[in-house]
């Protein structure tokens, strides 16, 4: 084993350096292309006349995979919920605390739809 390492140390080191450089280049490319991709998506919305999908009825499903282990909602899920209906902001303000954690009274709604009637049934709060 020592003979193998002695003979191939340079190649192993070169492979490690190559992987490190690849990761650095990949991260730099992602950083540079993300704003460009977002701009092109917005431009496509303008050209096609399309826009983000909006639901006609307020409500979303609060799934367990949208939450961390400590019941904190992921930022990307919150952004998605907020983008699909204007009333979702009120729903999220009611069911999440200041740390974006689902309040204990609403944890029984995980896996179900969140709308005005389920919030009223769970806590008595009228939205």
Swiss-Prot record:
Primary localization: virion
Question: Which terms are listed as keywords in the entry?
Answer: Capsid inner membrane protein, Membrane, Virion
Cellular component annotations (GO), alphabetically ordered = membrane; viral inner membrane; virion membrane
Q: In the record, which residues are listed under signal peptide?
A: none
Q: Where in the cell is it found?
A: Virion membrane
Please give the positions of the paired cysteines in each disulfide bond. Answer: none
Which branch of life, at top level? Viruses
Coiled-coil stretches, from where to where? none
The name this protein carries in UniProt is: Protein P6
* Organism of derivation: Pseudoalteromonas phage PM2
Lineage of the organism:
Viruses, Varidnaviria, Bamfordvirae, Preplasmiviricota, Tectiliviricetes
Q: Which gene encodes it?
A: VI
């Amino acid at each position: 084993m020592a003979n193998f390492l002695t003979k191939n140390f340079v190649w192993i080191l070169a492979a490690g350096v190559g992987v490190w450089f690849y990761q650095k280049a990949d991260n730099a490319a992602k950083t540079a292309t993300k704003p460009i991709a977002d701009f092109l998506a917005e431009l496509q919305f303008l050209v096609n006349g399309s826009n983000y999908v909006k639901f006609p009825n307020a409500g979303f499903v609060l799934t367990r995979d949208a939450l961390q282990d400590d019941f904190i909602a992921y930022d990307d899920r919150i952004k998605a919920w907020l983008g699909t209906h204007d009333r979702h902001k009120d729903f999220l303000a009611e069911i999440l605390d200041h740390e974006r954690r689902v309040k204990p009274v609403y944890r029984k709604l995980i896996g179900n739809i969140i709308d005005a009637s389920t919030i009223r049934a769970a806590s008595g709060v009228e939205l």
